[in-house]
Amino acid sequence: MKTKFKKNGRRLLAAILCLVMAVMALPMSAFAWTSEEGKRCTSSFGDYYVGSDGEYYRSKATYSFIVYDSKGNITVQSIKAGNAKRKYLMTDNSGTHQVYCVESGIDFNTGNSYVSKNGKNSSYFRKLPTDAQFGVMMALMYGWHEGKSSPVAGTNTDDYAFATQTIIWEYQQQLRTSPSDLHSANGIDADTYRYSLKGRPAEKCYDWILSQMASHYTIPSFAARNQNKADTYTLKYNPDKQNYSLTLTDTNNTLANLSLSASGIKVSRSGNQYTFTSDKMITSPITVSAQKAVNLDCDEMLIWGCVGKQTMVSGASDPVYFYFKLDTETYGTGLIKKTSEDGVVSGIKFNISGNG
């Protein structure tokens, strides 16, 4: 019996060890993190970024960067660098998670206490130019997050993550205002950050992310970016289906499914044809807010702040909204009853006229 117990005990212990090793091998994102404001984390440095070519990613030996004050005004500073770039980590009671820097040039130290805020409530993030906010958010949408593999053949997750970080810095430093526009600004060279990945595997990921961002920023041809410029489209009544519908063609060929804000309105897509349907009459035009239906596969974007230290960001949120207005044609039924003094109505003709 003792021998049998020892054998079974060894088997049980081996099974437990295998389970522990399997759990440890899971990517960090297998455990949900947070989209919660007011969450506290402690900062630390992670490993160095190592490209799929086996080399570190390094910054320029010296470079200049802009710093934002509390009112959004900027000053230009310079720093000696050339160091290999490391990952930024945040730790809370759920574990340790990799985040991105959204404030280039400012100190990031181990052991600082950070607090999370929604991007809309972060005073730091809101003082960035609108183009910079949009760019950072879209880079996070298509960039690396825990648990994601690189979409570019021949590259690894460090290449993908470092490319994401590079694009975030370019927007935050006002060197980029769109996926296709990289330029010098405020005396800072356009290639200050791109320098680190030029000719390296991460450059392929960098190009891929920017192409996805450009595609995402393109909206359907029947929509407008501004509510005040939204066109109105009238849904026609279908007596057979007893509903109202209209099909619109997107000549921009975004080929994206849509998520609508308006209740009671359904949308389906076939290629670049979008069919909008309502079961009820719309008595006056309604403005529909829409977004592309994208699976972000991560938590909502949070800005992590610590007084006097580098501002960080995690998660992703879609900043691209577009608008159009929908109306329905009026449709009704009428009942005409023929009457006469003598009760004989057969053969009586009516002439109905109107502008409807």
Which stretches of residues belong to each language-model region?
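N-terminal Lys/Arg-rich, disordered targeting/topogenic segments
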Residues: 1-5
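C-terminal segment of classical bacterial N-terminal signal peptides
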Residues: 22-31
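...the same signal can extend to comparable exposed beta-sheet modules
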Residues: 32-39, 278, 351, 356
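Short, surface-exposed polybasic-aromatic patches that bind anionic ligands, especially phosphate groups
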Residues: 33-215
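Predominantly extracellular/luminal cell-surface or secreted proteins
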Residues: 171, 261, 351-355
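Acidic/charged, solvent-exposed loop-and-adjacent secondary-structure segments enriched in E/D, K/R, S/T
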Residues: 176-330
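Structural motif
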Residues: 246-252, 335-349, 355
